[in-house]
């Protein structure tokens, strides 16, 4: 029996790309399913080659697949449809930005909100992080599943080596786009 092949397109190796795509799909282990994880920045990735794409049953991606032109995207979508390949779009964050967001101006200029909403409509299924996002996504595509963020606790970075102490330690990890969220914690630390 031939293995069921899944092409997982990863946009980066940090943050979202790592925790939503690379880590979970690297741990995926099923005897009848082969997961092929590729970096989108790999210039040898032939997403325009129907012969290459035809070996896969599912394509998974987060954020977007950066096509050079709308025609490339259209050709890709037509090939995927001809080959009956299912598209799973992983969406980890709300795509409607407030004007306080550092990328708001660029987001508006590039109609990024509209692009994300179109990707939601086009996908066969969407995975997301929370019930809140699932409800927002369902307005465009009802085939949405919550897959919470997770970490591989067997990785060295998560192996605890803590020493007992009376001190309270707090660790926060995130990018500049989460600064507004971090400010919500300020009153608790002022007590």
Model-derived features: positions:
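Nucleotide-sugar donor phosphate/pyrophosphate-binding loop at the beta->alpha transition
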Residues: 43-47, 86, 97-118, 153, ...
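Conserved catalytic-core segment of nucleotide-activated headgroup transferases in glycan assembly
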Residues: 10-27, 36, 152-159, 163-191
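N-terminal pre-catalytic "stem/leader" segment of glycosyltransferase-like enzymes
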Residues: 1-67, 181
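Active-site proximal beta-strand in glycosyltransferases
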Residues: 58-59, 80-97
């Amino acid at each position: 029996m031939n293995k069921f092949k899944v092409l997982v397109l990863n946009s980066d190796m940090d943050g979202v790309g790592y925790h939503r795509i690379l880590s979970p799909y690297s741990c995926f282990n099923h005897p009848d399913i082969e997961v092929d994880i590729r970096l989108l920045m790999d210039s040898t990735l032939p997403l325009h080659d129907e012969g290459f794409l035809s070996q896969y049953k599912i394509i998974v991606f987060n954020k977007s697949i950066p096509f050079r032109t709308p025609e490339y995207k259209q050709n890709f979508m037509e090939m995927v449809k001809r080959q009956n390949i299912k598209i799973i779009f992983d969406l980890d964050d709300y795509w409607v930005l407030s004007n306080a967001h550092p990328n708001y101006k660029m987001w508006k200029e590039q109609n990024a909100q509209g692009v994300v909403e179109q990707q939601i409509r086009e996908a066969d299924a969407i995975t997301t992080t929370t019930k809140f996002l699932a409800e927002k996504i369902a307005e465009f595509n009802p085939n949405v599943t919550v897959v919470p963020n997770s970490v591989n606790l067997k990785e060295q970075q998560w192996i605890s080596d803590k020493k007992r102490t009376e001190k309270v330690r707090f660790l926060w990890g995130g990018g500049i786009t989460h600064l507004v969220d971090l400010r919500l914690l300020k009153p608790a630390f002022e007590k």
